[in-house]
């Protein structure tokens, strides 16, 4: 579509019902501010110019909306005098001249490009106002779209609707497309002769008809127009988003044993033939390649899991974790800012942070890379085909050469050459018959403590 378009995002509400210290549009859906989802939908609809109408938390909202995919200009609505008043806060942007003006809300993160494009296409056919509506089983509380012979006659609020009109299930979704050449004239005709003294965008329908123009409605799925005013609605939107994304991934070849227990971030990338077991959480910045397996109860964030690698169960991958092909990070392991080479194994109860583990190496249970000295982080380098025995502490900065072997229980503070064997522990001593003597001493000490406590 070659027509020019300005999208106006209304995001100036007080968010009172959210009971929050920040604007509702900043609350995350799938790990990202909900307003960023709206901007992405606009970008997907090939809309590049956005006027953002802000109120509280103006700077933070503007930052969240500036995703880089569109050009965003912010406009402050100083008073809250209705939706039409909010749109006119962006008058300077409208005056630049566009074929289409599209009005959307910052709290509808489930909206997709399809209804936005459909609305613009109907403007291109010569209509002056296009309202995006939805069909619902329970229209109570919604404004009804009064349509006759394909033309939208009015938007009737529930409280003002007749009994016959209340039986209508086609409802106003709030989003609207307006002919750019007529937008300012139409908006300027909206009055505030109502109980609240506010300027309502919905009045445009009857205004344009009174001037001989034409208004119509296009339908979108109800869930796409779901707005967010409360924490309960935020949770509902999150659930809908997760359901939609899981379905998309499974249709693309990802297997999920119990999809309802898998939680994805907005940018999670799962390739074909990835298997995800129950109760897995993906944070932002995750890419999982084909054939990888994410076992149950794992948490993955900011990580790259390469082809054929396995994670978990009960594993945590933190930002910067990079697992090589067919590598393994097993149960109760944590990996942070570390590269695990191809075929390397970190099987049990291990922390690998700020480290490089070479291909084919085996890291024993309980191994820790001691990367933090209280002030700075330091790097541990482990070569290829190296064996680290159980319960080893590798005190960074330290390097262990390829093919080396580190004995169980060692504390390694110096570099280990390739193919060397390193012991970093005290030699075991055995004292025959000493155990009964120690037990007697311990019992006596225990009795003495009890006696002192009783005397207090």
From Swiss-Prot:
Residues annotated as binding UDP-N-acetyl-alpha-D-glucosamine: 10-13, 24, 77, 82-83, 143, 157, 172, 229, 318, 336, 351, 362
Binding-site list for acetyl-CoA: 365, 371-372, 390, 408, 425
Q: Which PROSITE patterns match?
A: HEXAPEP_TRANSFERASES
Please list the GO biological process terms of this entry. Answer: cell morphogenesis; cell wall organization; lipid A biosynthetic process; peptidoglycan biosynthetic process; regulation of cell shape; UDP-N-acetylglucosamine biosynthetic process
Instruction: Quickly give the catalysed reaction.
Output: alpha-D-glucosamine 1-phosphate + acetyl-CoA = N-acetyl-alpha-D-glucosamine 1-phosphate + CoA + H(+); N-acetyl-alpha-D-glucosamine 1-phosphate + UTP + H(+) = UDP-N-acetyl-alpha-D-glucosamine + diphosphate
Biochemical pathway: Nucleotide-sugar biosynthesis; UDP-N-acetyl-alpha-D-glucosamine biosynthesis; N-acetyl-alpha-D-glucosamine 1-phosphate from alpha-D-glucosamine 6-phosphate (route II): step 2/2; Nucleotide-sugar biosynthesis; UDP-N-acetyl-alpha-D-glucosamine biosynthesis; UDP-N-acetyl-alpha-D-glucosamine from N-acetyl-alpha-D-glucosamine 1-phosphate: step 1/1; Bacterial outer membrane biogenesis; LPS lipid A biosynthesis
The catalytic activity of this protein is classed by the Enzyme Commission as 2.7.7.23, 2.3.1.157
Record's family?
In the N-terminal section; belongs to the N-acetylglucosamine-1-phosphate uridyltransferase family. In the C-terminal section; belongs to the transferase hexapeptide repeat family.
Matches recorded under PANTHER family: BIFUNCTIONAL PROTEIN GLMU (PTHR43584:SF3), NUCLEOTIDYL TRANSFERASE (PTHR43584)
**Gene name tied to this protein:** glmU
Residues annotated as catalytic: 348 (proton acceptor)
The record's section on InterPro entries has: Bifunctional_GlmU (IPR005882), GlmU-like (IPR050065), GlmU_C_LbH (IPR038009), Hexapep (IPR001451), Hexapep_transf_CS (IPR018357), MobA-like_NTP_Trfase (IPR025877), Nucleotide-diphossugar_trans (IPR029044), Trimer_LpxA-like_sf (IPR011004)
Q: Extract one GO cellular component term from the record.
A: membrane
Matching entries from HAMAP family are given as: GlmU (MF_01631)
Q: Which UniProt keywords apply?
A: Acyltransferase, Cell shape, Cell wall biogenesis/degradation, Cytoplasm, Magnesium, Metal-binding, Multifunctional enzyme, Nucleotidyltransferase, Peptidoglycan synthesis, Repeat, Transferase
Q: So which cofactors does this thing need?
A: Mg(2+)
Q: What is this protein called?
A: Bifunctional protein GlmU
On assembly, the entry states: Homotrimer.
| Subcellular localization | Cytoplasm
Q: Where is this region: Linker?
A: 232-252
The segments labelled N-acetyltransferase in the record are 253-456
Q: Where is this region: Pyrophosphorylase?
A: 1-231
Note how many cofactor molecules are bound and how.
Binds 1 Mg(2+) ion per subunit.
């Amino acid at each position: 579509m070659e027509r020019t378009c300005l999208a106006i995002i209304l995001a100036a509400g007080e968010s009172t019902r959210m009971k929050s210290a920040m604007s509702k549009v900043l609350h995350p859906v799938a790990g990202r501010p909900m307003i960023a989802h709206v901007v992405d939908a606009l970008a997907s609809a090939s809309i590049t110019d956005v006027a953002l109408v802000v109120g509280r938390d103006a700077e933070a909202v503007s930052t969240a909306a500036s995703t880089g995919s569109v050009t965003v200009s912010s406009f402050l609505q100083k008073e809250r005098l209705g939706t039409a008043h909010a749109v006119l806060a962006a008058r300077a942007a409208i005056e630049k001249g566009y074929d289409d003006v599209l009005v959307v809300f910052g709290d509808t993160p489930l909206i997709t490009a399809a209804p936005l494009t459909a609305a613009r296409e109907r403007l291109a056919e010569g209509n002056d106002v296009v309202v995006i509506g939805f069909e619902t089983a329970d229209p109570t509380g919604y404004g009804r779209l009064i349509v006759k012979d394909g033309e939208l006659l009015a938007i009737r609020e529930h409280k003002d609707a007749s009994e016959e009109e209340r039986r209508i299930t086609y409802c106003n979704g709030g989003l609207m497309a307006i002919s750019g050449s007529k937008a300012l004239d139409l908006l300027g005709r909206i009055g505030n002769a109502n109980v609240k003294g506010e300027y309502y965008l919905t009045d445009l329908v009857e205004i344009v008809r009174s001037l001989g123009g034409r208004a119509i409605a296009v339908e979108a799925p109800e869930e796409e127009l779901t707005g967010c005013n409360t924490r309960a609605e935020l949770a509902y939107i999150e659930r809908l988003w997760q359901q939609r994304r899981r379905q998309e991934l499974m249709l693309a070849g990802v297997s999920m044993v119990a999809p309802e227990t898998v939680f994805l971030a907005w940018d999670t990338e799962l390739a074909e033939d990835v298997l995800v077991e129950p109760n897995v959480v993906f944070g932002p910045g995750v890419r999982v390649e084909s054939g990888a397996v994410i076992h149950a109860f794992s948490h993955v964030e900011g990580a790259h899991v390469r082809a054929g690698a396995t994670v978990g169960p009960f594993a945590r991958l933190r930002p910067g974790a990079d697992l090589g092909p067919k590598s393994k990070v097993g149960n109760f392991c944590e990996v942070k800012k570390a590269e695990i080479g191809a075929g390397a194994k970190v099987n049990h109860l291990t922390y690998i942070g700020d480290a490089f583990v070479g291909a084919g190496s085996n890291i024993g249970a309980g191994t820790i890379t001691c990367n933090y000295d209280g002030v700075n982080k330091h790097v541990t380098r482990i070569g290829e085909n190296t064996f680290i025995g159980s319960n080893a502490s590798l005190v960074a900065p330290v390097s262990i050469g390829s093919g080396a072997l580190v004995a169980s229980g060692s504390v390694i503070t110096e570099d280990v050459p390739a193919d060397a064997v390193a012991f970093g522990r005290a030699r075991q001593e055995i004292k025959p018959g000493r155990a009964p003597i120690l037990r007697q001493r311990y019992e006596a000490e225990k009795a003495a403590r009890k006696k002192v406590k009783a005397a207090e």
